[in-house]
């Protein structure tokens, strides 16, 4: 017999896996492939596909004598997961890219009409997508609420400073007019001590909760008991030249 044309030894070892390192150009292309605004939609679609595949594989594990039961489970899984799978499976990446571009155009249009905070939309969208994956919607809602409060607080403080004196004066005038009615002074003398006690207890509870780090307590307002005592305890000087006995300060008990 003629010798083989190749004297190289035959190796039974499997071929080594070749690892391809990503170049900066490849990473840039992959980054461009990601969605800027609708990344969370892509993540939701991927999670639905994984859950559907896992449920289908679980239904297939019991082949054999229990096949009729497995077929029943498989049919149930298809009936429940199938519509969700079909809905997300039919949304190609090109369509998501199109929607993402439309969102971007809307943000750019809004950028000319609203404050610069809109410029942070792409970063906020990525941050929201990460929060949804890590902590769920509850944590995201809490963070967004805190952010909204932080942005609205300066404006609210300005409005409060501007209109507080007017509101305080109107409240005192209304209180003085109300005390002219029969029986009102005697009723308020009976009610105010209990109301003052409850207000003080409420303020103490809120302050203690804030010291313990309660997130809810930090947003609860305190009852301005001293200001209420000053406003409602004494009639305005110009409310009447000679106030009637009903308008005299309510004695504390």
Swiss-Prot record:
Residues 13-26 have a biased composition (Basic and acidic residues). Residues 1-26 are annotated as: Disordered. InterPro entries: REF. It comes from the Eukaryota. It holds the Pfam family REF. Transmembrane segments: none annotated. Disulfide bonds: none annotated. Belongs to the REF/SRPP family. This is REF/SRPP-like protein OsI_017815.
